[in-house]
Amino acid sequence: CALPIFILVALAAVFLFLLFQAWPLIGGDQAANTATIESFTGNRAHNFWQYVGPLVFGTVLVSALSLIIAFFISIGIALFISHYAPKKLATALSYVVDLLAAIPSVIYGLWGGLILVPAIQPVWNWFAKYLRWTYIFDGSLNDPSVADSPSRTVATVAVVLAVMILPIITSVSRDIFMQTPRLQEEAAIGLGATKWEMIKLAVLPFGKSGIVSASMLGLGRALGETMAVLMILSPGLTYSIKLLRASQNQTIAANIAAQYPEADPNIGVPVMIGTGLVLFVITFLVNFVARKITEKASA
């Protein structure tokens, strides 16, 4: 009984600390706040919300893209481990998935920056050449922002984050699929269903709430990811959805990590704490909505 109370107290303490520290910037003297933001951003933003808006957009964009990339691959791997692979292979793959989940994010950042960035450039060049009519893949091959920072774009970061959250979604989904009642599976097979039809009729409906929970866990990891984004993405403060252009977007967590060490205690630190409060609220809302969706799916 004491542990849940401790968790609630800790959560409330973090929220109140962020709110107390950020409130003068959010709800205080707006003229003074404007001067603070203009000084901190070099006149690129004139109020707190104008500054944090592109960061929220970049955070949501990168996280959503990574979830889209990872979701179907994770579910496929989880189904293969739970229902298709021989026992020894399934055990080995489970160990690999669990190991991937334990790798520190800075290692993923090094891999992304040193290996993936140059390796994936030809792929993005192909997208830019043949799919630029879609607007989101509009990235001129002669664009200086691409030439100076090859592949240090939202698209590349989304791929790296997808690899990071893939083992989380896979692991949780695998465990849920393996809990499917044997009687339901045998009943579907007994009615003449193929293995894939049995999965569609029994396994996926049984595991839909678990799939939602796994996806939200992965999304939460992506929302708060710092080092991998910081080490790969060429940052910018815009509302751009051009995934192949550098210096367009930035995430809240990576921006805090980049700015905080050199931030002025009277100017920069309150701004960083304010953006941290926004990230806290976003993460809380995502988990709250996920909880409601899971409850609805379980009903």
List where the protein language model places each region.
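Membrane-cytosol interface at the C-terminal ends of specific transmembrane alpha-helices
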Residues: 80, 138-141, 146-190, 194-197, ...
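Short, small-residue-biased leader/transition segments that mark boundaries at the very start
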Residues: 1-3
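Transmembrane-helix boundary motif in ABC transporter permease subunits
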Residues: 66-97, 110, 291-295
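Periplasmic/extracellular loop-to-transmembrane helix junction in inner-membrane transport proteins
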Residues: 20-66, 86, 147, 258-269
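Membrane-interfacial helix termini and adjacent extracytoplasmic/periplasmic loops
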Residues: 28-50, 108-163, 243-246
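Glycine-rich helix-loop "coupling/hinge" segments at transmembrane-helix boundaries
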Residues: 221-265
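C-terminal transmembrane helix and the adjacent membrane-cytosol boundary/short C-terminal tail
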Residues: 174-178, 182, 258-299
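Transmembrane alpha-helices
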Residues: 96-99, 103, 107, 169-176, ...
